[in-house]
A protein has these predicted regions:
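Short, electropositive alpha-helical surface patch
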Residues: 58, 115-119, 150-165
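Charged helix-capping and loop-helix junction motifs
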Residues: 72-80, 118-122, 154-157
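Short catalytic/ligand-binding loop motif for oxyanion handling, primarily in non-cytosolic enzymes
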Residues: 13-14, 64-66, 105-107, 146-148
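A short secondary-structure junction signal
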Residues: 106-111, 141, 148-152
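A conserved mid-domain beta-alpha-beta active-site/ligand-binding segment of alpha/beta enzyme cores
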Residues: 130-145, 157-191
């Protein structure tokens, strides 16, 4: 799977989150990090979209929406003829959203300070995915990055890597398979650390076996209840 990350940040040089995200995927050859400029070559942008399977729009939240830079890019590149019309050039591709905010995540809910959830605010992108026959992915929202402690940043790094490269969904089984594949790569690349990494890999596989057994037991119990 090839992933294209469209970075729409009007002040990219001053961003704290974008260098973090860029570093997180720099060793993944199947991921393209593509910061937008103010002028677009439509044919080149459309070609990039066609070459990738998962398209991720990445931006800071500006007044409950994306920055004007992304809107300009979409209006220019996503022509009706290309994205919808008779071509549906993006049909079957995945569309993901990575949005960063300066507010606490708990503020984005009914009855709280911002009143609306991030998913509600991002509905225009879901509508776009529906119109162009793309698969809309769950949103990855990052709140108050500057206040994240080291362990939270590490969890975010892994979550971001999975969001951009994991072929499966967000279920434990898919996450475990992703971890196994990535650990195996590191074992091959760093033989000196293989013993420790092998132990971690063994633990993940063991937990997956336990989960499979639990799921099987639950299925059997459900069958007995239905009799």
């Amino acid at each position: 799977m090839q992933t294209l990350i469209i970075v729409a940040h009007p002040e990219l040089a001053r961003s704290n989150t974008q260098p973090f995200f860029k570093a997180a995927i720099e060793n993944f050859s199947n991921v393209t990090w593509h910061p937008l400029a103010t002028d677009f070559n439509v044919e080149q942008e459309q070609s990039l979209l066609l070459q990738n399977d998962r398209i991720i729009l990445e931006f800071p939240l500006y007044w409950y929406s994306a920055p004007a830079l992304l809107k300009q890019w979409m209006d220019t590149v996503m022509t009706t003829k290309f994205a919808a019309g008779h071509q549906y050039a993006l049909e079957g591709k995945e569309l993901g959203i990575v949005v960063s905010t300066g507010d606490n995540g708990n503020a984005f809910q009914a009855g709280a300070a911002e009143k609306f959830t991030i998913s509600e605010l991002m509905r225009p992108f879901e509508a776009f995915a529906n119109k162009t026959k793309m698969m809309y992915l769950p949103i990855l929202a990052v709140h108050q990055f500057l206040y994240l402690e080291l362990d939270a940043q590490q969890r975010l790094l892994v979550a971001y890597q999975q969001y951009t490269t994991n072929v499966g969904g967000g279920h434990f089984k898919d996450q475990a398979a992703w971890f196994e594949a990535e650990l195996q790569k590191r074992i091959d690349q760093h033989p000196s650390h293989s013993e420790q990494l092998q132990q971690i890999l063994f633990t993940i596989k063991e937990r997956q076996d336990e989960l499979d057994d639990l799921q099987w037991n639950l299925i059997e119990m459900k069958k007995e209840e239905d009799v």
